[in-house]
Amino acid sequence: MIHDRIEDFLASLPRTGALAGLDLGTKTVGVAVSDGLRRIATPLLTVRRTKFTEDAAKLKAIAAERRLVGIVLGLPRNMDGSEGPRAQSTRAFARNLVQVLPLPVGFWDERLSTVAAERALLEADTSRKRRAEVIDHVAAGYILQGVLDRLDWLGREGGA
């Protein structure tokens, strides 16, 4: 099931279990995973996109190996909050993904996640070559950590 509101997505999940965060690009998919208690997001890998069926098979394997209970897709909104062609492409990917990987899917505003990831990698004095290799899954980590922080906040506020 696909949830537009992150609160609805979080409410659909079991109390524990790992989540994945995906940073969907035209050529790659950055993947990050959480721990089972959903406290920490860890960048995992970058999948080179080929055909959807092959991409989905790789994501299914990760979901099985990590025992995922849900997936968060970064939703690329424009700076004014509107959705453009990239956001529509992300929504289409989600619709296709739930057909082959029946897990709850939620969206998280990914504006500036790649900028934050790039800044963190620069501050860590990461080489240009290494930054290019890891930027997508580091950005996925930022996306997923945002969701985990929201979940924590909702829990403290009694909303989840």
From Swiss-Prot:
Annotated localization: Cytoplasm
Record-listed E.C. numbers: 3.1.-.-
Molecular function in Gene Ontology: nuclease activity
Gene Ontology biological process terms, A to Z: rRNA 5'-end processing
Function: Could be a nuclease involved in processing of the 5'-end of pre-16S rRNA.
HAMAP family recorded: Nuclease_YqgF
Descriptive protein name: Putative pre-16S rRNA nuclease
Organism lineage string: Bacteria, Pseudomonadati, Pseudomonadota, Alphaproteobacteria, Rhodobacterales
